[in-house]
Amino acid sequence: DSVVRNDQAFSLFSSFTLGYYREAMIVLWALLVENKHFSSAVVNSPMFSVLFADILFFVFQGKQNGTLASVVHLCGVILLLLSESEDFACALNKKSPQTLPFDLTGVIPGTSTLTDVLILLMSSLFCEVTEYDPLLEMFLIVLSNSSSGLQGLSFTSASKLIALIGRLSRSKFLVQSPRNSFLLTVALDIIDNVLQSSLANNPSFVYVALENEKLFRRIAEMTPRSILDSAVAIPRPKDGYEPEPAPQLPPFATEQWYQKLLSSMCVKHIVDIIQALLKETQSICQGEAEDQDRLMDFLKSVEYPSEIPLVSHQMRKYEHGLQSAQWVVA
């Protein structure tokens, strides 16, 4: 009697309703945990794009309905487990189904890749990042785990991803919670992996990264003092009004903590790659209307700068435990 039902919980690509969709997803989660080879079978299935779209649909539904919080968490766990498969990135490079169970600005069904859909859904759910959210962390880790093999990212999804990094790098956000800096670190790992591994296969992504060189340079030039000063900046009082008391930083936001943050970010490596590519493009850009077309043609065949060493990033895996199991089935 306590089984959760939802009349909208069905696959739009078949006539079979999934009245017990939560139970079906728990079975999938259990199989992925118990059988490490099962994830490869799932991501290599010809129906993977349909399954992936349905999982994102449940996330989309759950974020709008507080009673489905456990379903949202379950979807995140399933995606994390799937992202540990070596073939997951290749699966994300596939085109999305011709019909999607939700509408997202920037997504073209049948043309956008599954990675584009994932990034644009993440962007729509977290268009204003004001506090730490475990779902955002799951999305970022899923992308980070697969980022070295991603190809064909669209201009729109690349722009949204880098815009998210801009929001995650705000000083006030970083000092809000000790976990927030981890979100920025993982997001930067995504950018670095794509730039290192798939330059020629992601011309739109590289183009957007070059356009945002100032953002990455600003993050790279952050110092403990500048972050702290920016986070507690006091606006000038208006005439006739007393200045507001200076906000207090949380206890964790020490200079030592920020030194650890700055050392964990790969942003300086990103800046080195971008600046090397910008030097190569100087002869292409001549201040003419055709510059963008010439630049895109160049980026389709660009090679990684040989003078910049490669940097490896860790695979972040899901850790199964009693607390997670209780949360999922709650």
Regions found by a protein language model. Give the residues of each.
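Alpha-solenoid helical-repeat scaffolds
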Residues: D1-S70
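Eukaryotic scaffolding regions of large macromolecular assemblies
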Residues: A53-L56, K63-A330
